[in-house]
């Protein structure tokens, strides 16, 4: 067994994903999810060596109780494995401009994460609760913060500055930050290996497609543009998020239709996207089923989703200058051969030609090139953000 194991924690507002990852191989020794925090049926599910387990956490429990369960029940039952854990790695959604790389957590870092909470009000406060809980449960282990926004700090100003008064950026930090950076970093790195090119000479466009979705242009291993903005709302059509809209729609909804700003925020984040267009579901699998059955709303939602994505991919050839590959990842990107084919067919001007057999084979965790031999390359790379967090954690504590 490796002596480079890391406990990776990803704390949401009402859930906590966790895994014990081998930083050398990326394999998970333990993985699980605690959910329904604050409700009567808070519970935890986990898997060890393929064997599934489940337990109640008790009514109205939260992050602290979940971390204590992981320590006192799950890891206590695996003493040999637990003894090999070298660090606790935390996924942090928003690091603003304060954090351009992963860092060992101390009180200064905690303060910085707190100061970025206004940019990720649903996520950063939950991350801080998880950090405090992990510090209490693992007082002797170093804690590491890995930021979703850090990978995008290489973007030039022309990519991240909005065409608003510059003082809003200078005084308030209003700019494009981007998300899914850890995923885009991992798959762009893996894509270079598939292409058998040095990362510094590889230009790819990565599409991380899940309930949240973003596209990033990666030039020589560095992010040069990305679709999400100040928050995860900008960019692509997503499960329940609208992505790009005319900003004046907000004014119209408030002043003409009587919405409050809170209602508008809820509308754009939780009632729009695939769900809003289809009036059916936010789940892409349900959208594809509706499309196959001729459901008008599902068909329209699928077409808009693919069209918006194709437009973004096309536009990101501009900062790259040369395109080596398009990379699909995330739950939708890794599993929807329908969406991949539709998007690439819209991009035939760039000489994309889908190989149907390869495309259908690249599902359920399988990676590979999905285009014909005479085509510009498109591929599927299953993401592994936890591995990046584990790697960064080990690198930092062994410096």
From Swiss-Prot:
Key words of the record = ATP-binding, Cytoplasm, Kinase, Magnesium, Metal-binding, Nucleotide-binding, Transferase
Note the InterPro entries from the entry.
Ac/propionate_kinase, Aliphatic_acid_kin_short-chain, Aliphatic_acid_kinase_CS, ATPase_NBD
State the Gene Ontology terms under molecular function. Answer: acetate kinase activity; ATP binding; magnesium ion binding
- Output the GO biological process annotations, alphabetical, semicolon-separated: acetate metabolic process; acetyl-CoA biosynthetic process
Q: What PROSITE patterns does its record include? A: ACETATE_KINASE_1, ACETATE_KINASE_2
Query: What's the record's note on cofactor binding?
Result: Mg(2+). Can also accept Mn(2+).
Q: In which pathway does it act?
A: Metabolic intermediate biosynthesis; acetyl-CoA biosynthesis; acetyl-CoA from acetate: step 1/2
Pfam families referenced in this protein's UniProt entry, alphabetically: Acetate_kinase (PF00871)
Residues reported in the UniProt entry to bind ATP: 17, 208-212, 283-285, 331-335
Record's GO cellular component terms: cytosol
Entry keyword annotation includes DNA-binding: no
For this entry, the protein name equals Acetate kinase
Tell me the lineage of the source organism: Bacteria, Pseudomonadati, Pseudomonadota, Gammaproteobacteria, Alteromonadales
């Amino acid at each position: 067994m490796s002596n480079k194991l890391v406990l990776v924690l990803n704390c949401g507002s009402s859930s906590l994903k966790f895994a014990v990852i081998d930083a050398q191989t990326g394999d998970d020794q333990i993985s699980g999810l605690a959910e329904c925090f604050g409700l009567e049926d808070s519970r935890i599910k986990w898997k060890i060596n393929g064997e599934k387990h489940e337990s109640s956490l008790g009514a109205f429990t939260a992050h602290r109780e979940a971390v204590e369960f992981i320590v006192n029940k799950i890891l206590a039952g695996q003493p040999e494995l637990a003894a090999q854990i070298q660090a606790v790695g935390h996924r942090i959604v928003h690091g603003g401009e304060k954090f351009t790389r992963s860092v060992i957590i101390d009180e200064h870092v905690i303060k910085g994460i707190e100061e970025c909470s206004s940019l990720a009000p649903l996520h950063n406060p939950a991350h801080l609760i998880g950090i405090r809980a992990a510090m209490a449960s693992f007082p002797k282990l170093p804690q590491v913060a890995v930021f979703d926004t850090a990978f995008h700090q290489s973007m030039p100003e022309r990519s991240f500055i909005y065409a608003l008064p510059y003082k809003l950026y200078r005084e308030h930090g209003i700019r494009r930050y981007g998300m899914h950076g850890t995923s885009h970093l991992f798959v762009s790195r893996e894509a270079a290996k598939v292409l058998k090119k040095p990362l510094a000479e590889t230009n790819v466009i990565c599409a991380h497609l899940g309930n949240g979705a973003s596209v990033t242009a990666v030039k020589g291993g560095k992010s040069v543009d990305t679709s999400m903005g100040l928050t995860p709302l900008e960019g692509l059509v997503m499960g329940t998020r609208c992505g790009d809209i005319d900003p004046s729609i907000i004014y119209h909804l408030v002043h003409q239709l009587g919405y409050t700003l809170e209602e508008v925020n809820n509308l754009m984040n939780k009632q729009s996207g695939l769900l809003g267009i289809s009036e059916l579901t936010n789940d892409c699998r349900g959208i594809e089923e509706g499309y196959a059955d001729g459901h008008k709303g599902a068909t329209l939602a699928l077409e808009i989703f693919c069209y918006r994505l194709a437009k973004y991919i096309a536009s990101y050839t501009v900062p790259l200058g040369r395109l080596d590959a398009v990379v699909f990842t995330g739950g939708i990107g890794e599993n929807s051969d329908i969406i991949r084919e539709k998007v690439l067919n819209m991009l035939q001007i760039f000489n994309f030609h889908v190989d149907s057999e390869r495309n259908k084979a690249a599902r359920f965790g399988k990676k590979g090139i999905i285009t014909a031999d005479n085509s510009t390359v498109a591929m599927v790379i299953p993401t592994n953000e936890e591995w990046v967090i584990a790697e960064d954690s080990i690198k930092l504590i062994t410096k």
